[in-house]
Swiss-Prot record:
Keywords annotated in UniProt: Amidation, Neuropeptide, Secreted
Domain of life per record: Eukaryota
GO CC field: extracellular region
Compartment list: Secreted
Protein name per its UniProtKB record: Callatostatin-4
Tissue-wise expression: Brain, subesophageal ganglion, retrocerebral complex, thoracico-abdominal ganglion, peripheral neurosecretory system and intestine.
Function: May act as a neurotransmitter or neuromodulator and play a role in the integration of information within the brain. May be involved in the control of visceral muscles due to its ability to behave as potent inhibitors of peristaltic movements. May also fulfill a neurohormonal role on muscles of the gut and heart.
UniProt record, GO biological process: neuropeptide signaling pathway
Length: 8
């Protein structure tokens, strides 16, 4: 979802 999606 977020461009920096690391699982947050």
């Amino acid at each position: 979802d977020r461009p920096y999606s690391f699982g947050l």
